[in-house]
Amino acid sequence: MAPAPSFRGHQWTYNPVRGSCLLLLLLMSNLLLCQGKSCPSCGPDVFVSLRKSFTDRFMNAASLSHDFYNLSTIMFNEFDEKYAQGKLYYINVTKSCHTNSFHAPEERDIVQQTNIEDLSKWTLVLLYSWNNPLHHLVTELQHMKELSNAFLSSATRFENMSEKLQAFIERQFSKIIVPVLNTMIQARSSWTGLPSLMSSDEDRRHSEFYNLFYCLRRDSRKVDMYIKILTCRTHKTC
């Protein structure tokens, strides 16, 4: 089996022809489902209507990713205000993110040059990487009685948003799932903060919560940017 491709930001170049072909193939795959069947929707305007449905799905995903990032920012700011004032949790927090080893691009000019396949791969890499820590984050927050029900509800909603975004990318780009998993295995990235999150030492526990909320906000911003650029590509507006 060939090794999984390497996705370093400085090596990426966006090929508009390849990107357009990928979108066309995705649309044509839906058309092929109608062959040999009685299909009322397979009239002369089927391509236009399929493309509209395709782009509408991306618009919905872009709206969801926007809310995804905004909610992560709200949660970080609220936790920071309530628990981190006068603390030194922010020191070295950028080095604590478990997704650092992926080197997922965050500069917009680099992301804009990235092809559709790699953008979708990076989106899934980040979302998959948060499944375990996000589950434990939501679970452990339930034990913090001083947090408002609204905050706990936001954390649960955020986890649901992540699942919906994953499902969307998986449906649109199913062939990238194995390469994504290979990339994650090769990066040897894993979250090791569970002992701190469950510690009886309140300061240690709060420090880990702070790290998670900080890194979650950073990575959700990347996911939002990737999906918005994928969306503008489908609309041919960028």
From Swiss-Prot:
Under the heading Gene3D superfamilies, the entry gives: 1.20.1250.10
User: What InterPro entries does the database record attribute to this sequence?
Assistant: 4_helix_cytokine-like_core, Somatotropin/Prolactin, Somatotropin_CS
Pfam families given for it? Hormone_1
Q: Where is the signal peptide?
A: 1-36
Q: Which pairs of Cys residues are joined through disulfide bonds in the record? A: 97-215, 232-238
Where does it live in the cell? Answer: Secreted
On modification after translation, the UniProt record reads:
N-Glycosylated; the glycans terminate in either N-acetyl-galactosamine (GalNAc) or N-acetyllactosamine. Terminal GalNAc on Asn-linked glycans is greatly reduced prior to parturition while lactosamine-type N-glycans remain unaltered.
Q: Name one GO biological process term.
A: mammary gland development
What are the UniProt keywords, alphabetically? Disulfide bond, Glycoprotein, Hormone, Secreted, Signal
The record's GO CC annotations read: extracellular space
Chain positions carrying an annotated carbohydrate: 70, 92
Q: Which GO molecular function, any one, fits this protein according to its record?
A: prolactin receptor binding
Predominantly, its location class is: secreted
Query: What is the recorded function of this protein according to its Swiss-Prot or TrEMBL entry?
Result: Placental prolactin-related proteins may play a specific role during gestation.
PANTHER family in the record, alphabetically? PROLACTIN, SOMATOTROPIN,PROLACTIN
Homology family: Belongs to the somatotropin/prolactin family.
Protein name (Swiss-Prot/TrEMBL): Placental prolactin-related protein 1
